[in-house]
Each structure stands twice: as C-alpha cells, then as structure tokens.
A protein has these predicted regions:
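Conserved GNAT-fold acetyl-CoA-binding loop/helix
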Residues: 27-46
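Short loop/turn motifs at secondary-structure junctions and domain boundaries
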Residues: 47-52
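Acyl-donor (CoA/ACP) binding surface of acyl/acetyltransferases
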Residues: 1-25, 55-161
C-alpha cells in the first residue's frame, strides 16, 4: 500500500517558504481556492490557520513535496474536509494517491467514524480519479466562480469507520 517512503509531519511554520512556492505556482493552485500571487505574509496567515488541524506536510527524502489533510468542518459531527496539493514536479508519480490513502488511514485510526468531504472541478481529472479510487461518492454539483470563471464543482463524500 505505501511504497514511496513518504514521510508525514504536522504542518508548522518552518515550511513557510515551501508553501509560499507551492501556492504561487499557477498550475498547482488553478484547481484550488488559493488566490494568485500570495505574499509571504498571506501565506503565513493561511499556514497559521492550519496549525492544530489534521493537515500534514509530505516529505520525500527529507524534501517538501506537498501537503495532505482533513481540516475540520464540524468537529462535533466528525465532519472534515479532504484535500492534497503537490509540487508540479511531483505530479504523476503516485505520491498524491499514496498520501491520500495514508491520511484516510490516519483518520480511521485516530478519529474512528468520520465523514470526509472533497470538492473537484471536472478539469481536474487526476484528482477525481483518486477520489473515486478511494471510495468517495459524488453527492452533488454546484456552480462556482474560480478565478473569474464559472465552473461546475462536484462535491464528494466518504464515510470512514
């Protein structure tokens, strides 16, 4: 199941420059809610909001390659988001799939029963494929304005036990 030797560490401020680079790559953020051209201060604020959440940096050979996590949506009801973002140089290597499987296993071990929610736009074929492989079910669609374009967003859900 886990074959790439990826290491996971809770998000912390020491990865600020890595996140700044990640979130200023147009290809990486085009499928996300991250706006373009984040300042280092804006990056720091986003990162600080994640401290204490179930969000991990992903390391390969001690180098930052991405992030994966399940931020709380409603802790009382055990509802969490689900996302991952990887440096463009790491796309197509299977790391996103492995990290996604890892964080779901982590949630099972540490939270027991929970519901994970993920959103994807149709152009993000690779991510939608990963969600389906992991057992996420499409529960609805909506329209959203992402960076000035109206797109259909597919909403997925996974019950974990």
């Amino acid at each position: 199941m886990f074959e790439y030797g990826l290491v996971y560490r809770l998000v912390n401020i020491t990865f600020l420059n890595d996140f700044h680079d990640l979130w200023n790559d147009e290809e990486v953020i085009k499928y996300t809610a991250v706006r373009e051209n984040l300042s280092l201060y804006d990056t720091q604020q986003r990162l600080m909001n994640w401290i204490g959440e179930t969000i991990f940096v992903v390391l390969k050979d001690n180098e930052f390659i991405g992030v994966v996590g399940c931020p709380s949506v409603n802790k009382k009801n055990r509802e969490y988001g689900f996302f991952y973002q990887f440096k463009r140089s790491e796309w197509g290597k299977g790391y996103a799939s492995e990290a996604a499987e890892w964080v779901i296993a982590y949630m099972r071990r540490n939270y027991g029963t929970a519901v994970l929610y993920a959103d994807v736009i149709p152009d993000n074929i690779a991510s939608e494929k990963i969600l389906k492989h992991l057992g996420f079910i499409n529960i609805s669609k909506s329209k959203a304005n992402i960076k000035g374009n109206t797109v259909t967003v597919k909403h997925y859900k996974l019950n974990i036990e």
